[in-house]
């Protein structure tokens, strides 16, 4: 069962991947599946933040400080990106219940 991501969830990158910076954007390779995944500048900023475990609320606050974006849009886009990274098995999600 896929974990539900909320602002209280903690996310961190999976170990089975490698990534590199490409002129401010990021390219990620899932070592198990062999699939590449690309991130734009904002996505790359988020990727850098989650190299260590971070709460979604901390990531959102960092993005709001760095970029000119409405808080609701920021949260919706952040949750959508994290869900996509989770589905591609590039991140782990831990909720307060230990999931």
Where are these regions (language model features)?
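Long, charge-rich, low-complexity alpha-helical segments
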Residues: 35-99
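Acidic, low-complexity/disordered tracts enriched in E/D and polar residues
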Residues: 1-44, 48, 94-99
